[in-house]
């Protein structure tokens, strides 16, 4: 956003124009290169007079880190210069503004849009984590968007960043209180996991329109941060089970109980495997080749599963593709694959009716034999609820979650069950439930793929992500 005040400083090779923002010891300007290319950049001008020892250390850290890393979701430091009055960081220009403004203009973001941004942020954090770098000041204001339309997230402002191994601990207060982990504010020891808390706050703000510790005064903010109460998630808007689980695990006050980096990167809501990228289309086409082969062999169930898996990559491929002609060609292919998957679904559905009838007599015998095992009874009852919901047509994520919870418990019980008739029945019941859960999972994926393909989700996400 342009601002008034004194004229921008002079920088050799560049013309500084509008002021984009002002911080504690720096002002950022939009600038144009004087060469033929007229390259557009952002120039961070740091007044030497404003620097104290701590800010000098922060600046040197930022330059050192940004000079040595290159990543598509981290703002690039192109060069740096200095004169008698200023130090200049010449950086990649991001025309889409910052994530804070993006959220504020929309009040809240749809979960699907928030997930795309989260995947990109996770991608940047994994790169930093692999290089033992912690940002320590993650907040929406430090997350820039590359363009107004179909933006790519760019992590910026590494003034507080540190080279930190997973076992390193710090004591110095860094970052912005609204987004800082409780262990930082309380001046206890902290480590790299503080960045995961900040990710949770950013995701919470994107989904609900405000950070969890939003306050009218610093005293109120401090009380909320120092409280032992668990973070409560609003009931509206409703979240998917995976999204809710991730938020709760990120916003765990106790860093020892908080989700780890490895668990975060592997979490199903983050789902880095299916984030839009240059390899999405290749992975999708490889799966289609396998699907066609299984289809020709007459294995309808395997073919359907492979088509569904391929569609999970085609959707991010659509989102990643910027060329309109290629995008339309992909969309046409996706439509054809969805049509074939629909035909296979009908074939598999007729076979699945037999599956729905399986296990009923054996299940009743197993329940009778489990009366002296309350834990087994409870797990079988949960499985029965899942089966009943599915037979009533409630073939949704809640039913699948019931299947998964009951199977998790039953598998543990099977491992401890001695040899005998009950163990045989339990093993057979688990096999039946696993088959039903797998079929239900394919049905859910199929519906999602249909929605994505037929309604051109990629374009709807793009319009949701476009700055007006």
Curated annotation (Swiss-Prot):
Its main location: cytoplasm. One of its GO terms (cellular component) is phagophore assembly site membrane. SMART domains: MIT, S_TKc. It comes from the Eukaryota. Keywords: ATP-binding, Autophagy, Cytoplasm, Kinase, Nucleotide-binding, Repeat, Serine/threonine-protein kinase, Transferase. Gene3D superfamilies: Phosphorylase Kinase, domain 1, Phosphotransferase system, lactose/cellobiose-type IIA subunit, Transferase(Phosphotransferase) domain 1. This is Serine/threonine-protein kinase ULK3. One of its GO terms (biological process) is protein autophosphorylation. ATP binds at residues 20-28, 44. One of its GO terms (molecular function) is protein serine kinase activity. Belongs to the protein kinase superfamily. Ser/Thr protein kinase family. APG1/unc-51/ULK1 subfamily. The lineage of its organism: Eukaryota, Metazoa, Chordata, Craniata, Vertebrata. It is found in: Cytoplasm. It comes from Gallus gallus.
